[in-house]
C-alpha cells in the first residue's frame, strides 16, 4: 500500500515537472516568434527577388533581346576561352574584349 502511494507521488511529481518545462518552452517560443518571423520574411523576400530576376532573364532569352548597358559597365563575361554577352553597349561605344566593359 505504501509502495503504491510512493509510486503515485513520484509519478505526479514527474508529470508536474514535465508540464512546467513544456509551459516554459511555449513561453520561449512566443518570445522568439518575432525574431523567427522576421528571419523567415527576409529569406522569403530574397527568394522572391531571385525569382523575379530569373523570370526577367527568361523573357530576354525567349524574345532574343539583350538589355542595354551604360559606358563603363561590364558588358561581357569570360569563362575559359569562351565569352558571353551580358548587355548591348550604347551607340558609339563597343565592348572591350580585354576589360570586358563598354568603352
From Swiss-Prot:
Keyword Nucleus in the entry? The reply is: no
Which biological processes are named by the entry's GO terms?
adult feeding behavior; cellular response to starvation; defense response to bacterium; defense response to fungus; G protein-coupled receptor signaling pathway; killing of cells of another organism; negative regulation of appetite; positive regulation of MAPK cascade
Q: Which UniProt keywords apply?
A: Antibiotic, Antimicrobial, Disulfide bond, Fungicide, Secreted, Signal, Toxin
Q: In which tissues is it expressed?
A: Expressed by the venom gland.
User: Record's Gene Ontology CC terms?
Assistant: extracellular space
Q: What's the superkingdom here?
A: Eukaryota
Question: Propeptide ranges, please?
Answer: 24-52
Q: Which residues form the signal peptide?
A: 1-23
Q: Report a single Gene Ontology molecular function.
A: neuropeptide hormone activity
Disulphide bridges in this chain? 69-87, 75-95, 89-102
Q: Which InterPro entries match?
A: CART, CART_C_sf
Chief subcellular location equals secreted
Consequence the record notes for mutating residue 91 to R: In Niq CART2 and Niq CART3
User: Keyword Signal, does the record have it?
Assistant: yes
- Cellular compartments annotated: Secreted
Other noteworthy facts: Two short synthetic peptides Tn CRT2 (AA 78-90) and Tn CRT3 (RKGSQMGKKCECP) have antimicrobial activities against both Gram-positive and -negative bacteria, as well against the yeast C.albicans.
Read off the PANTHER family from this record: COCAINE AND AMPHETAMINE REGULATED TRANSCRIPT PROTEIN (PTHR16655), COCAINE- AND AMPHETAMINE-REGULATED TRANSCRIPT 2-RELATED (PTHR16655:SF5)
| Reported function | These peptides may have low toxicity to eukaryotic cells and low antimicrobial activities against bacterial and fungi. It is unknown whether these CART-related peptides affect feeding, as mammalian CART peptides do.
Family assignment from sequence similarity? Belongs to the CART family.
Kindly provide the name given to this protein in its UniProt entry.
Answer: Niq CART3
Q: Which organism is it from?
A: Thalassophryne nattereri
Amino acid at each position: 500500500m505504501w509502495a503504491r502511494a510512493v509510486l503515485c507521488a513520484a509519478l505526479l511529481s514527474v508529470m508536474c515537472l514535465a508540464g512546467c518545462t513544456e509551459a516554459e518552452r511555449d513561453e520561449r517560443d512566443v518570445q522568439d516568434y518575432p525574431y523567427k518571423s522576421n528571419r523567415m520574411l527576409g529569406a522569403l523576400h530574397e527568394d522572391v527577388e531571385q525569382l523575379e530576376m530569373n523570370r526577367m532573364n527568361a523573357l530576354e532569352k525567349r524574345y532574343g533581346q539583350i538589355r542595354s548597358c551604360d559606358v563603363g559597365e561590364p558588358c561581357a563575361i569570360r569563362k575559359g576561352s569562351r565569352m558571353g554577352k551580358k548587355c548591348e553597349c550604347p551607340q558609339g561605344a563597343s565592348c572591350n574584349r580585354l576589360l570586358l566593359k563598354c568603352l
